[in-house]
Amino acid sequence: MNALLLVAHGSRRQQSNDEVTVLANKLRASCHEDYRIVHSSFLELATPSIPEGIENCIRDGATRVTILPYFLNSGTHVVNDVPE
């Protein structure tokens, strides 16, 4: 079963993290044919972490997880950390 994991930076501001969760819910509704499972995760400053997000997908039955980076610009994390 295919899963989509939305990965955002994460923020100390809870409202920003909540916006990522709202986006994941919208993706879940619009991508249901291709991705039966959709979760969000964060690189830092918020939970779930990326490994936890992958575990959540697997727990829900995923056999394949597609990572969707959600960053607004090409900073250090986008260029160096995410590809690793």
Residue ranges and their predicted role:
Residues 1-84:
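Active-site-proximal alpha-helix that buttresses catalytic centers in soluble enzyme cores
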